[in-house]
Swiss-Prot record:
Name of the protein described by the UniProt record: Integration host factor subunit alpha
GO MF terms held by the record: DNA binding; structural constituent of chromatin
Gene source species: Bartonella henselae (strain ATCC 49882 / DSM 28221 / CCUG 30454 / Houston 1)
InterPro entries reported for this sequence: Hist_DNA-bd (IPR000119), Histone-like_DNA-bd_CS (IPR020816), IHF-like_DNA-bd_dom_sf (IPR010992), IHF_alpha (IPR005684)
UniProt cross-references to PROSITE patterns, sorted A to Z: HISTONE_LIKE
GO biological process: DNA recombination; positive regulation of metabolic process; regulation of DNA-templated transcription; regulation of translation
The encoding gene: ihfA
Pfam families: Bac_DNA_binding
Length: 108
């Protein structure tokens, strides 16, 4: 498994190469898409990208937490968190890739 992290710049480079936009235009397009996803989530809307994933904002209620070092209880305030649920198509693609890699390793 690789430890590479894909960045905004990496995405912009792929758009530049595959779509034919300039690097500046590609970076602006990536930024526009990410901003729209963020804005939708801020408004409380779910973002569903077919065959990829669904992002949703979930409300978490107040609860009591505990400091793991001291054991002292402390309230955890209510908040909103973003959840990511991978689509079955993405899950299967990752599983297939993992199985193919395992098959190659076992035949070496």
């Amino acid at each position: 498994m690789t430890s590479k992290t894909v960045t905004r710049a990496d995405l912009a480079s792929v758009v530049c190469r595959k779509v034919g936009l300039s690097h500046t235009e590609s970076a602006a397009l990536v930024e526009l898409v990410l901003n729209e996803i963020c804005n939708s989530l801020v408004r409380g809307e779910a973002v569903k990208l077919s065959s990829f994933a669904t992002f949703q904002v979930r409300k978490k209620n107040e609860r009591v937490g505990r400091n793991p070092k001291t054991g002292v209880e402390a309230p955890i305030l209510p908040r909103r968190v973003v959840t990511f649920k991978a689509a079955n198509v993405l899950k299967q693609r990752i599983l297939d890739s993992h199985r193919a890699r395992q098959k190659i390793i076992s035949h070496e």
